[in-house]
Amino acid sequence: MQKTLLICCGATAREVLAIVKGNGMGHMQVESLPAGLHNTPQFIPERGREKIRANRDQFERILVLYSDCGTGGRLQAVLDEEGVEGLGGAHCYEMYAGAAAFASITDEEIGCFFLTDYLTRHFERLVIQGLGLDRHPELRDSYFGNYK
C-alpha cells in the first residue's frame, strides 16, 4: 500500500482519524490545518501548499481533504500546481453526506447551518469570538438571520 498523507481541516480531523483507525488504514497518516482558517479562507491555499511541500518527500501520495471552503478557487489552483488531489465541491462538509445528498439538502433548504461536533465544542472561540459577536452582538442577525 502507498504511504499516504491526508491533509484535512482541524474541524474534520477527528472524523477522518476515526475512519483511518476504524478501517485499519495504517498506511495513512492524518495531519490537519487549523480549523480557524475557515474564518480567514484566503490563507487556506498557502497553508495547504506549505503542508504539502513540508511532507512531499515522506509520502508516496498526498490527498487534501478540503473542498473550496471559501477560497474562490485558489485552493484548487494550488492543488493543481502541486499535483495533489482534493475533494472538489464547495464545502468540506459535503464529505459527510456525499456531494449529491449535500446538494439536495442545501437546494431544498438554503438556510441550512451544519453544526458538527467540532463546531459545537469550539463554538465560543470559532463563532462567538471568531466572528466578533462577543464585541459586536448586534451582528448576530446579520450573520445568522437567514438560517432556520
What role is predicted for each listed range?
Residues 41-54:
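Glycine-rich, highly charged phosphate/nucleotide-binding loops
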Residues 74-128:
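Long, charge-dense
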Residues 141-148:
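Conserved anion/nucleotide-ligand pocket segment
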